[in-house]
Amino acid sequence: MEVRFYSVGDIDEKAMRYAVIAAQHGGKWIFVKQKARTTWEIPGGRNEQGESIAQTAQRELYEETGALQFVLTEVCDYSVTRGETTYGRLFFADIQQMGPLPESEISEVLLQEELPRELTYPDIQPLLLRRVKETIQEIVEVTEEHVEPWVRMGLKLWPDHSFDEMHKSLLEILHSEKETAFLCRVGQLYAGFIQVSIRVDYVEGSDSSPVGYVEGIYVEESYRMLGIAKKLLARGERWAQARGCVQMGSDIEQHNAASYDFHTSVGFEEANRIICFIKDI
């Protein structure tokens, strides 16, 4: 079996048989279960005679989820080859209002942050959702409305901090001229963040001042390998450049091989290795 993706419009709409709609409501992805099945799937269905593929998506989204108000975005066209090749269009829906589930083949609607384990099409649906995640990413600078997801992710990166400590620290950054953060938003969900600062004291390996500094960077596990960290870093670098910086510093824990590989892959050079000591007195 092979799944391929194309730009919207590359495939003749007359050849399309399916519309698949990756939908979010209340900060969670929506999955549906048909009455005759015990597995979950992304909403979608067959194109009916006389419908455009966008009309198919709108109808299927309502019939399978009860969505009443939503914004529908075309993501891409796709094909699935398994003996024969079938074509469809992938959509993203940001649902603002849901009503009762209409009478249809759907028995249950599930809202959660990630794919269920029991999938109707396990070889196809993870690829479709991944494509949506790659396509609808948006990098935003933090404001007060982002504090809750920022704190939640910050505690995963720095688990030794309490909620109150993290909340206080991040609120201070909101009002700082020397430090800020950027979040990656995927629809209604937040998938990662970078916290950057301007340092005027010596930064290991630098030969300029001031220097931009990565105070922390984190991507939720299920959103890794989607290019999010690189996009966050690029946005942080532009912020530092606008403030007169020509270099960017960072540091990692010595055992963190994945973080080391990321830093070297995006152009950082190792400047030094430092071992820190502490003792109780």
Regions found by a protein language model. Give the residues of each.
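Conserved Nudix-box catalytic region and its N-terminal flanking loop in Nudix hydrolases
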Residues: Q24-E63
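Conserved acetyl-CoA-binding loop-helix of GNAT-fold acetyltransferases
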Residues: I53-R59, V219, M225-R238, S265
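Acidic, metal-coordinating catalytic segment for phosphate/diphosphate chemistry
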Residues: M1-V20
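Conserved GNAT acetyl-CoA-binding A-motif
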Residues: A240-I252
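Conserved beta-strand in the GNAT
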Residues: L183, L189-I198, Y213, Y218
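A short beta-loop-alpha structural element at the N-terminal edge
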Residues: Q137-W150
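Conserved active-site alpha-helix within GNAT-family acetyltransferase domains
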Residues: K230, A242, Q254-R273
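Unchanged
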Residues: E48-V71, D77-R131
